[in-house]
Amino acid sequence: MRYQRPKGTADILPGDSEKWQYVEATARAVFKTYQFKEIRTPMFENFEVFSRSAGDTSDIVTKEMYDFHDKGDRHITLRPEGTAGVVRAFVENKLYGPQVLKPYKVYYMGPMFRYERPQSGRLREFHQLGVEAFGSESAALDVEVIAMGYNLLKTFGLTDLKLVINTLGDQQTRDDYRQALIDYLEPHFDELSDDSKERLHKNPLRVLDSKAPEDQQFVADAPSILDYLSPEAQAHFDQTKTYLDALAIPYEIDATMVRGLDYYNHTIFEIMTHSKALGKGYTTICAGGRYNGLVKELGGPEVSGVGFGLGVERLLVLMDAENIAVPTDDQLDVYVVGIGDTASATTLKLVQALRAAGYKAERDYLDRKPKAQFKSADRLNARYTMTVGETELADQVVNLKAMATGEETKVAMADIYQDAHQVLDK
């Protein structure tokens, strides 16, 4: 039997893993400047955490979640997105209390799981970077989160970016708009897709998110939520636009954008890019928004939140397509060449001493001839070689060679053990 990875998953091998490390390290550095700190939550949660947060009619809950009953008959779900687990942790650990500074800012990174058709940059096990900020209803925080996502993508070298925003308003806005949508769509009920028929009276806003061809003409002509904003919702949206203008971040407004999760309200946004690597036209690379009711939905008090998620696989596909070079630090500092069996213990001691001093060091483990060892040093792009043979052992020295110049010197082993930096950093 041939064992293969499950469909929709990927092995991240050396050569690629360095790109992931770069993305994660860069994101951490950017998040740190905004005073966001890392949170780590379980990769699986109780089913209700996601069914309550994402919405019973969302594609995630109805079609895409990996859920099962464990041996204790608990209904468990592999996390399909990051926000709900973070909100659950926020509530369970009482981080909404007055003893915790607000806004409470956290970021996460790690694998998520959705049962969907694998395609370029979209897998069943995929990885997200995300941020969440709790405890402020200010539109300035919405814009800070948007700016952070926008600047992060620019830091990665992406240039053809488009920010699209919308508002889902407050509860009054959504109640009024919900009824307007039902009134508009009901006469066309028989022409809607099966999914949209099912959603029409449960959550008509989900119809606007439909990708079914038969729904597109109705989505295009649907009433605009912008015509149903309450004064408070209008003021929040106006402030958001004012702050974006102040930061000189260009944006477009798409009144049909609703996002794929039911917990959003007020500001929602998507940052898109135009790349053939992800298909025709603009595709979303980073998305998020405000969710003022989610903390209460998961058992906490009325505390507002705002955040975004960013797909790492899609980001890396884009970076490859744009030929964006990822900085690497894979040069070996020292390759220790051993000649003869008697040198083996000494070469092992030398590489350990070099590593303890902070250098990247390697030796041979295949009992090869010196010529083959020097070839390995070349392939590993070593800065130096240290050669130890019978003569060097007798004199307790190594033959140190600078690979760039070919210059060779004799160095006492004691000097290396005592202070390798004095030897290598002259």
From Swiss-Prot:
A single Gene Ontology CC term: cytoplasm
Location relative to the cell: Cytoplasm
Keyword flag Ribosomal protein: no
Catalytic reactions of this protein: tRNA(His) + L-histidine + ATP = L-histidyl-tRNA(His) + AMP + diphosphate + H(+)
Pfam families linked to this entry: HGTP_anticodon (PF03129), tRNA-synt_His (PF13393)
Keyword line: Aminoacyl-tRNA synthetase, ATP-binding, Cytoplasm, Ligase, Nucleotide-binding, Protein biosynthesis
InterPro entries: aa-tRNA-synth_II (IPR006195), aa-tRNA-synth_II/BPL/LPL (IPR045864), Anticodon-bd (IPR004154), Anticodon-bd_dom_sf (IPR036621), His-tRNA-ligase (IPR015807), HisRS-like_core (IPR041715), HisRS/HisZ (IPR004516), HisRS_anticodon (IPR033656)
Main localization (coarse): cytoplasm
EC nos: 6.1.1.21
Keyword Lipid biosynthesis: no
Entry's Gene Ontology BP terms: histidyl-tRNA aminoacylation
GO molecular function, one term: transferase activity
Top-level class of the enzyme under EC nomenclature: ligase
CDD domains (alphabetical): HisRS-like_core, HisRS_anticodon
SUPFAM superfamilies recorded: Class II aaRS ABD-related, Class II aaRS and biotin synthetases
Family membership: Belongs to the class-II aminoacyl-tRNA synthetase family.
Name recorded for this polypeptide: Histidine--tRNA ligase
